[in-house]
């Protein structure tokens, strides 16, 4: 059927697939390097405990049948290997059905991880990667030209990502409507990057322009994705430019990058397509059936978008096939950070020798400049930001985190930048205190070299020791 394929988008498909495989690789690498302390058998929220109380139908996963740290590591590293093979173009060397099965592997593996990932995998970009990855299975390889309906599904997904984010802002915090949110956002965002301090200190009129441009990109430009070329390519380019601006302004895991990847599928490159065979009938039937299913399931996110009680980052099915998205419906005006400290003193005193644990990405030492980590995702650091917003976010895991520090747990300490205690000599007590952080001014930066100024607010976790721990004299 001639209308079924769009040969002019063969290069867009190639670029999209290779870029998506890179995002998959980062996601699996993040899982492989961090899971043991977070989700492992002795993790902060162990998978075995989770699967005991959550049935397969609510959280389908390979780990519902069996879990071990070795099996999880094997799945994560296998995901890395398959993703690397896809980056290298292995799918182009396989028959069409083989390429589709190969693309199904990272989706199934990552679904298994996300569905047991609990609070550590509760971010919108997890579902976004899964939804994008599922659609990508049906894009085909060099044997056939890209199917029109799959290209449409990718645009439909990109539309929901951008338009949903725009709507949640207009319905949420009043500062988005007043164009003032960026007076605070760069300072209070979850994980600032190396340029965030400078973004915060841009002139306020420029902040207004930033917010207005963001509204146009998220509320107007998405409709242009469904217009003829070259307008659709221009719309995609505007979205890519906006996302790259966000990449410079902070660490948002791979959220910005996978949005860029989706936009790349819209671009029509001025290159003649190679010859490709007609799509086999079985492929047409499968693609059309999947497209019909996804469009039917889309009624739920559409209903959510038009609702005045719109929610963001919600999955409507356990396979994460069609989801709703959004970001920063509300913006914090004040930044709080939980500072974790330990002491080797025999008794905890306020004026004792308390030493601070340093995190990789979370602000801590006021003189330490934020680093660039995205698209790599520091899950513990992100959840520490939520913990500072409310202890309720940290309820399931923070006490266990303190316990692991007292035990000198190697896996947990590897998530941190530095422990103030030498290996084998953990602290007797651990405590946590809440501080208010603000960016220094240009003058303060020149005089002190510090990018942050912090003020003590209150105790977060009182001095705690291991239950039944013997005195060490």
Language model features: what each stretch is:
Residues 1-473:
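Alpha-helical membrane-anchoring segments
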């Amino acid at each position: 059927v001639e209308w079924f394929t769009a040969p002019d988008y063969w290069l867009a498909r190639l670029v999209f697939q290779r870029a998506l495989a890179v995002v998959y690789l980062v996601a699996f690498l993040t899982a492989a390097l961090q899971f043991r302390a977070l989700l492992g058998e002795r993790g902060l929220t162990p998978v075995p405990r989770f699967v005991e109380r959550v049935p397969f139908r609510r959280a389908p996963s390979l780990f519902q049948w069996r879990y071990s740290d070795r099996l999880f590591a094997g799945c994560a590293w296998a995901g890395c290997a398959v993703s690397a093979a896809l980056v290298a173009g292995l799918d182009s060397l396989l028959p069409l059905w083989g390429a589709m099965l190969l693309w199904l592997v990272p989706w199934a593996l990552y679904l298994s991880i996300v569905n047991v990932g609990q609070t550590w995998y509760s971010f919108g970009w997890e579902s976004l990667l899964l939804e994008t990855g599922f659609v990508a299975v049906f894009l085909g390889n060099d044997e056939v030209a890209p199917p029109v309906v799959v290209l449409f599904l990718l645009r439909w997904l990109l539309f929901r990502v951008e338009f949903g984010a725009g709507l949640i802002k207009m319905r949420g915090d009043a500062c988005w409507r007043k164009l003032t949110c960026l007076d605070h956002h760069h300072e209070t965002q979850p994980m600032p990057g190396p340029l965030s301090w400078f973004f915060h200190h841009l002139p306020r009129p420029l902040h207004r322009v930033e917010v207005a441009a963001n509204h146009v990109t998220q509320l107007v430009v998405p409709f242009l994705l469904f217009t003829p070329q070259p307008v659709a390519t221009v719309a995609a380019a505007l979205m890519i430019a906006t996302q790259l601006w966000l990449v410079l302004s902070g660490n948002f895991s791979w959220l910005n990058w996978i949005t860029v990847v989706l936009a790349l599928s819209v671009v029509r490159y001025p290159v003649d397509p190679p010859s490709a065979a007609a799509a086999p009938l079985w492929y047409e039937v499968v693609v059309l059936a999947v497209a019909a299913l996804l469009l039917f399931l889309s009624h739920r996110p559409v209903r959510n978008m038009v609702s005045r009680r719109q929610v963001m980052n919600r999955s409507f099915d356990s396979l994460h096939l069609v989801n709703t998205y959004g970001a920063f419906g509300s913006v914090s005006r004040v930044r709080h950070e939980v500072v974790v400290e330990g002491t080797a003193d025999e008794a905890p005193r306020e004026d004792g020798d308390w030493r601070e644990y340093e995190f990789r990405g979370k602000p801590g030492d006021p003189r330490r400049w934020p680093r660039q980590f995205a698209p790599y995702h520091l899950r513990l650091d992100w959840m520490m930001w939520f913990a500072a917003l409310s202890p309720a976010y940290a309820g399931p895991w923070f006490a266990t985190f303190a316990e692991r520090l007292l035990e000198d747990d190697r896996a947990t300490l590897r998530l941190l930048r530095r422990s103030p205690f030498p290996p084998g000599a953990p602290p007797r007590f651990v405590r946590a205190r809440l501080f208010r952080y603000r960016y220094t001014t240009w003058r303060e930066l020149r005089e002190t070299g510090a990018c942050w100024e912090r003020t003590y607010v209150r105790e977060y976790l009182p001095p705690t020791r291991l239950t039944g721990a013997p005195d060490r004299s």
